[in-house]
Amino acid sequence: LKEEIIATSASGLAWTIVYIALIYRGLKDKSYGMPLVPLALNFAWELVFSIIYPPSTTGIAGTIINGIWMLCDIGILYTYFRYSYNYFYNRYKITKLTWIGLSIFAFIVSFEIMFIGGPFFGQFKYYFNGDIFQGAIFIAYIQNLIISVCFILMIWERRDSKGQSLTIGVFKCIGTGLTVGIYYLFWQHHGKAALMNIIVGVTFLLDLLYILTIYRQLITDGFNPWKRL
């Protein structure tokens, strides 16, 4: 339990830095840094698993961290709804009403996934010990894999660094694979969680690729990667 609280707290701090950096860069660049799908999944996860199904093993510490993340997500939501429509219009030529409808639909579906998914995975006692929040952790790692893919695709599609920074990439990597990822695989499951080994391992490699990609893009855009928050 002590190791879990340490890993969760370290991950919570790292991801809070990621969220603050996303908000800061979004406002500074008048852009948005988290694509719609991972943003909707993230917000729904933190809403459901801090209020409806709060963590049982990490207690109040886990609930507070999830609550802080949910509040940070509101800031990221602002940058998305404030600045993303132009990107959608330029790329897909959709109307603002269509964009709003698709965005709302993404958030509704994400909420349903989290609300139903936690209990669904939690029912498998052999792997998740009948604990809904253990199911939530599994969902979170799949979600993190999606985030990593979307971050890379966003840079490749935009061909600029707006809304992004090396800070986001480095602390995402720390907050996922190098903290709770290590705990989950080697302390809790002793390296025997084959599927999670693949998910966490691939996510870690994609995070390294994202760090390299944003570093090169910042150089191309004329920024010092180490001085851009």
For each predicted feature, which ranges?
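Hydrophobic cores of alpha-helical transmembrane segments in multi-pass inner/ER membrane proteins
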Residues: 14-15, 68-78, 143-150, 202-213
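Hydrophobic alpha-helical transmembrane segments of multi-pass membrane proteins
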Residues: 34-52, 66, 172-181
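Membrane-interfacial loop-to-transmembrane alpha-helix junctions, especially the N-terminal start
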Residues: 27-39, 161-168
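Membrane-proximal helix-loop-helix units in multi-pass membrane proteins
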Residues: 82-158
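Non-cytosolic membrane-interface motifs at loop->transmembrane helix junctions
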Residues: 58-67, 127-137, 168, 190-200
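Hydrophobic transmembrane alpha-helical segments in integral membrane proteins
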Residues: 1-15
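Internal transmembrane alpha-helix with an interfacial aromatic "cap," most often the third helix
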Residues: 16-29, 46-100, 112-121, 214-221
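C-terminal transmembrane-bundle signature of multipass membrane proteins
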Residues: 150-157, 166-229
